[in-house]
Structure formats: C-alpha cells, structure tokens
C-alpha cells in the first residue's frame, strides 16, 4: 500500500499533461486502496470528494496546480483516516488503570509491553498484570517482556480466576504507588465471537473499574475490523483502540479506515515487532508517509499562507471602504503572511508591476527585511489592547515595549508614526471616494 501510493504521487508530480495525470492518479488511488482492503464505498466517497473539490475550487494564486491537487488528496485521505483528531494519550489522573482486551493472535500481550514502555519513557511508574489465563504462554511471555524493559509484572500462574488476579495485582501495584497499571486480559475468543469477548470485558470492567479500556486489533483482518470495532465502541464509552502489526500486512489501510468509520478512536499503531515500535496515531502524519511526501506540510503551509494573504486583502478592502478600522494587529498579520510567502524580492516578483519592483537594489531589500523583523519584535511586546488601539501607549509603555523587544524607543516611535501615516492615507482615500460619489465621478 505504501509503495503504491508513493509511486503514484511521484508519477503524477513528474507528468506534463495535468488533466490526464489527475484522471490516471484517481484511478490508481482507487485500485491501491481497494487492494489495501479499504471498503469500496469508502473509496468511492473519497474519490468523489476529490473530484468535486477540484471542479468547484480554484488553486490559490502563486500555487502550482499539481501541488494544490496533492494537498486536496492529502486532506481527503487524512479525513478517511480520522482527520485532525490526534488522540489524547496522557493520563488525565493518577493512578491510571488501563485494561487491554483483544482476540487471540491480535498481539495483545506484546502490545501491553509496548504500552508500558511508552509510558515509562514519559516518566511514569508502570506495572503490568498478567490476567490472561487461557493462553498457556501468556504469563511467561509477559514476564519476559517485563524483564526486557525493567517493568514489574504481577501474575498468579496457578489461579484460574482472571478477575481475582486482576484485583490482587491492582491492589499490590497501587500500594507500591504505581502511576499506571496495565492489565493484560484473556484473549481466548476468535474473530466472529465478538459477543463473548465483550461479555467477558464487561465482567472484568464491573469488578476493577478501569479508567480506560483499550481494544487491540490485528491490522491483517482489514475491513473485518469494522464489526468488532463497532460493537466495542458501542459497549465501551471510555474505550479506544490500538491497531497492531501495521508493518506486516497490506490490509492496514482497510483496518484503520474500518475502525474510523465506526466512530471509534485509534490511539496507537504498532509499527514493528520491537517493544519501542508503538506510535501515537496521527492521521495527517500517517497519510504524509503514505504519500511519501515528507514535505507535504510545507506545501500545505504555502497554500495556507497565500490564502491568509488573500483574506487580508479582503480585510484591507473593508478598511479602505470605511467598514472597519486599521489596527496594528492587521499590520502584524500582514507581515506574518508576507514572511511566510518568502523574501521581499520573491514577493515583489509576484505583485503587479513586478518589472519596476524587481529593480529595487539588494541593499534596500535587506533593509526592508530588517525593518520588518524590528517592527514584528515591537508588536510582539505589545498587549492585544495596544495592538487594537495604539493611542493608549504612553512614554512609560514605549520604554517597556522597547526593552521587551530589544530595540530603541526611537524604533517604537517610528512604528507608531508609520501606523499613523498609513491611517491618514486611508482617510484621504476614503474622502476622495466620497467626493467622487458626491459629484457622480469615478471611484478610480
């Protein structure tokens, strides 16, 4: 799945015929996702949304069409895998009790160790409870994992009552002031026996009252994950999921998209066999890797910068028409947008009259860049109240602002003077427009 999408993106970005390349890319995307066991309806919905957006939307000025198209694909794939919802993985209270459930073969016991190591690295004291009594090697496996990562494991090999083991282990670790206790429960049920698994989960839950229940799902089951995740999501209001073995299957995309379609939340994905190969599931980061675009965020940032600037242009039209007043906050936002778009020389080339502007000497451009940095530092030292109404700034505040920005009082005065001159100029423009209307003249 990964290589297929990366190759498709590379081929698209290197093509000469944009329209043809778009159609070919969408077809290839459909094939790749269906091969990855993503539900056909989800794939159709995804590609329909992409087609709709490229028909109805227009790329921002100064953005190359291909980059814009890939940013739309990135947005829609991210939405398929959960959008902007990055999970909260840090405990909201201490001690924090986590109960891990999952069918046999899901990688639940190994995931218990991975999760314990993740929290240990974050500075928490963690304990593991081996409450899986049905798989003969489960206790020994967890003991070995605990030794590898230097985390204590509680178990009672002769006891056949998992609830009793969990209760005793929890009591012991809470006495030892553990911050997080992870309980590895029984995994004796196969896929298709979700009802039995959830019934057992409920019995354990009612006795130990964990703060969180996490279901571990093997990525290789693909879109079959939908039924299990759906039932689990309905049965456990405090539940989340870990999708394990993402590295060993082509069906990972199917499993992830199926889980997301249920409304359940994926917290982590297992990316390898090693105990440190567990990562917080960030949909956008995941999609960025799928597309093989390490710099996708820079493309998105570039598009956002141009859109921000276009929004500012609209704001300035409102200022000139008298609908609103220009503030230092407006000027600050303009400078931020300009800085994101690149050096002054590059920006001048994008503006009308670029031929004349391109003749501005390099030294003058450098001075302009320095002045922008100085003015931004000054505005960073101001309060929101001062940015919205600079007239309240007295001499004492000027000194404080200058000190905070690492500039001179004269430079603060210069910024305020420039702001006042700009406002006066805008008043003149408004007056001229008013006179033109009064005498039936042109607004130009």
UniProtKB/Swiss-Prot annotation:
GO terms for biological process: SRP-dependent cotranslational protein targeting to membrane. It is found in: Cytoplasm. InterPro entries: AAA+_ATPase, P-loop_NTPase, Signal_recog_part_SRP54_M_sf, Signal_recog_particl_SRP54_hlx, Signal_recog_particle_SRP54_M, SRP/SRP_N, SRP54, SRP54_GTPase_dom. One of its GO terms (cellular component) is signal recognition particle. GTP binds at residues 102-109, 184-188, 244-247. Pfam families: SRP54, SRP54_N, SRP_SPB. PANTHER family: SIGNAL RECOGNITION PARTICLE 54K PROTEIN SRP54 (PTHR11564), SIGNAL RECOGNITION PARTICLE SUBUNIT SRP54 (PTHR11564:SF5). Part of the signal recognition particle protein translocation system, which is composed of SRP and FtsY. Archaeal SRP consists of a 7S RNA molecule of 300 nucleotides and two protein subunits: SRP54 and SRP19. Involved in targeting and insertion of nascent membrane proteins into the cytoplasmic membrane. Binds to the hydrophobic signal sequence of the ribosome-nascent chain (RNC) as it emerges from the ribosomes. The SRP-RNC complex is then targeted to the cytoplasmic membrane where it interacts with the SRP receptor FtsY. Composed of three domains: the N-terminal N domain, which is responsible for interactions with the ribosome, the central G domain, which binds GTP, and the C-terminal M domain, which binds the RNA and the signal sequence of the RNC. This is Signal recognition particle 54 kDa protein. It comes from Sulfolobus acidocaldarius (strain ATCC 33909 / DSM 639 / JCM 8929 / NBRC 15157 / NCIMB 11770). The gene is srp54.
